[in-house]
Amino acid sequence: RSSEIEYVVSTPEKQEERHEGLKRILARLPLASPLDGYRIVSDFGKRIDPINGRLAMHEGVDLTSEPGASVLATAPGVVVFAGWNGTYGKMVEIDHGMGVRTRYAHLNSIVVEPGRKVAARTEVGIIGSTGRSTGTHVHYEVLVEDQHYDPVKFIKAGEYVFSKN
């Protein structure tokens, strides 16, 4: 009850402080697409695996664009992996803090190295088809506390939060 009263009578400075804190958190979340101009070719969730024909969980979203398109970090963070990762092929993983990580897989080439701090929209690689892949795309994953979430929901949230309307 007293917290409600404190909130109601909080000073403009406290409200501004809360607002700035929220802006800092939003700025660290992956609320953008890793490609400028993209088409979804395979959604997040259960699907028929295009290689073996069996029902399987697809823990990311596959996005395609023009050949040679840059793959961009969707939020600031630190590159924790950049290299070959089995069925993912050439892959980059970024830790954004707060338990949030993103993965960018099947890249044709990688232009960052582990330990590098990256800003949002920093190029991390070039779209490709390495590893277990059936065509040129980026397989994009969002993990929160090691749980996979639908990346499209993050992209759409960013479009909503940062829209000018």
Language-model-derived ranges and their functions:
Residues 27-165:
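Catalytic cores of peptidoglycan-degrading enzymes
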Residues 1-39, 43:
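Non-catalytic extracellular/periplasmic "stalk"
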